């Protein structure tokens, strides 16, 4: 007989699961520089109201993956720059869809404490 604790998820340690887990989507606070806390969630949303920088997140753990849903405000034409940990295909950062209220999805995978591989799915409708 296993102890009760052996099969119980914990909230204060990193764990691996053999079945799907679901978390809430955490809203990021819009500002000149947006710094996600990757300990807070895997999936995020962000409505940008100006040209912004998505800074290197805090609390990176290799193996974490998720999405950041980025929405242009009602004005649009907003741009997004990226911190040095963000890595994209061919070394080129993607350009957001600039239409007012456009939605792009940034999919990411944390490789290490200083490297995040990401891909932008543009203009999702």
For the regions a language model picked out, list residue spans one by one:
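Acidic, glycine/polar-enriched metal-coordinating patches/loops
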Residues: 3-7, 46-125
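Fibrous stalk/shaft segments of extracellular and virion attachment machinery
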Residues: 1-26
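Sequence-level motif detector for i,i+2 pairs with an aromatic at +2
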Residues: 12, 39-43, 103
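The right-handed parallel beta-helix/beta-solenoid scaffold, focusing on the short coil/turn
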Residues: 13, 32, 42, 52, ...
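Transition segment at domain starts
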Residues: 23-42
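Flexible, charged surface loops at secondary-structure boundaries
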Residues: 10, 37-40, 59-62
């Amino acid at each position: 007989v296993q102890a009760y604790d052996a099969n119980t998820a914990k909230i204060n340690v990193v764990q691996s699961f053999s079945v799907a887990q679901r978390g809430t989507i955490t809203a990021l606070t819009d500002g000149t520089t947006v710094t996600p806390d990757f300990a807070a969630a895997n999936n995020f949303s962000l409505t940008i109201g100006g040209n912004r920088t998505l800074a290197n997140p805090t609390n990176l753990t290799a193996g974490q993956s998720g999405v950041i849903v980025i929405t242009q405000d009602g004005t649009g034409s907003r741009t997004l720059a990226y911190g040095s940990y963000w890595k994209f295909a061919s070394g080129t950062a993607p350009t957001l869809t600039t239409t007012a209220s456009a939605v792009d999805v940034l999919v990411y995978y944390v490789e290490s404490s200083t490297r995040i591989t990401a891909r932008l799915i543009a203009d999702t409708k």
